[in-house]
Amino acid sequence: KNAITTLLTLLVLVSCRPHRTGSGMMFETDCPKVNEAWELAVKTVRYNIRDSILAAGADYGGEWTRDVAINTWNGTDLFIPEVMERSLWHVTDGRRTVGHQYWDKIIWVQGAYYHYLLTRDTNFLKEAYICSRNTMKQLETVAYDPSYGLFTGPSVFNDGISAFEEPIYDASKPDLSGVMRHNTQNIKCLSTNCVYYMAYRALNEMHRILGETEHVEYAGKAETLKENIRRNFFS
């Protein structure tokens, strides 16, 4: 489902003639096949708009935080910015904190930041910064392991236990596919911690844009987390 939006991002890099229309950004190239691919990708994305939000697709039944964030990150704001804004807010709790699966929900911060970069909507950014800040504070309390200097929880996108081996996978629960039904609460994953690193950087950029100064705390935490990632995963 996110392969389509990755295609959209790649098309932006192709030699093209972008222009705005009433329904968003359109692209034209000198290659008919690329134009056809663009049209197919846009139709596929639009097909998955349900109740004015971009759904995760197939039979998932609605939106998911990581899907919304990654779709925004991959460029869907170029042609459905209003839908993506509604989708981003739809996975929050009253626009105060990000909801849904806790371990990688911080990816919403990156999605919200990219939404701003593509729309330049400062009012959105002000609210998104508050929501992002509150969510990071929450996760620093419940998901941070100071002994490693890393955040806990499963890896990004792996919400099914088939992605993990024993002993994380509990062989006594073969019928339970949900990742949180197994021994995943205290593991530390590279992808998830990289998302936290990006979130700290995005928070710093949001603060800089809104306040015209660097947020020393977020910038420092990003660097510290990067060092801890390198030490724990690569040394």
Language model: regions and residue ranges:
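Secretory-pathway/luminal and periplasmic proteins that interact with or process carbohydrate-rich
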Residues: K137-Y148, N228-S235
